[in-house]
Amino acid sequence: MSNSIRYISLEPVNLKTTYSEYDTIEFDVIFSGRKLRLNNIRLAADIATPNATPTTGDLRTKNTINDFQLDPMVGAHSFIDSISTEFSNAGKNSGTVESLQEYPRYAKMYYAGTQTMDGQMGSACACELRCPSMKCSNVLLRGGQAGKAAAQVYIPSNPHELANFSVRPRFLLNSVSSAQGEPMLSERQVGSCRISIRLSRFSNVFNGAGAIADITSYSLANVRLLYQTYADDGTDMPLVARTKANIKQNVNGNAITLNARLPIMANSMTASFFPVEDMNSAQKNTLALPEPPAVSRLEFSFNDSTNSYISYELRDKNSILQRAIQSLNPMDETNAVSLDMIKSGDMYMIGLGWESFIDLSRQKFSLLLNSGIGSSATDYTLYSYFHGILEM
């Protein structure tokens, strides 16, 4: 019996009936005498809005609030504004080992650069409220109905279930590999583990005209962390986790420079832009990846692991986008997206991958961008994410 899998449904430390925008939810993951199965940690919850009741669902009827949705590529990941991981064990990996801010935008960039919209139709996406279109997202938010004919699905008097989700966040404990097989983490390696999640503001979760006129807030109920543990066999696997660190800055000139020093061993970076004037608009999709005006030159420069100066200069859009796609999978993971697909989806990113890992706490990474932003009507925010590793 001791070797059996245990399926854990963990309540938050700061337990409440519901959580809303800006709330922090904390989970203490304790697995004494057991091993934590990595890459399978999920956040689950029910979604409620002021209009939601047991008989109306989240969006009431088909003809009411039909312009209200999540970003379809991000789905319920958009509820997670930030996620951090903290280990209690004394040693090189004690304290906060990853603190990923602006998480929904990272999720959007990752899925936009690695998956097609058709790939969003599987069951693994549906449970995360990820889907192929805005219209589909609107339907998912209405809540489920069982045993009803298609023509009756949107009748207000028919009982609905509240929409719910189960997402696998792309954070440190879900991004681990081991040469010895499926990665398992023992308490000896890290001690106890605390996962802290801060919820996004309403305008960064939902978008559409209905997000202004009809629904202006949300809450999450029955929030829980789902994971599995196995009996501890007394051995510790060497583990390597993919980790992320991010920074953002305002861009208001035709020539801008980003100089980054971050506590991460990185081998790639990816970035995207968004107009400052639209950042707080619930009507706009704040996770969109628009192209800034008149980008004419992009240059990356840094010293590599041998302290040799490296510089990459890109001038045409195809080269810029191709490098960005490659930067999301620097370890040669599967990538279903082609350059034509990301261009046709009106999604713009910049990025670069390089051959060896560099310590960005000691080496400065620089980015120079020439564009027409300074001559445009609005400033932009540049969101930069650096991808690295952490040995556990």
Model-derived segments and spans:
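Short, low-complexity Pro/Thr/Gly
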Residues: M1-M392
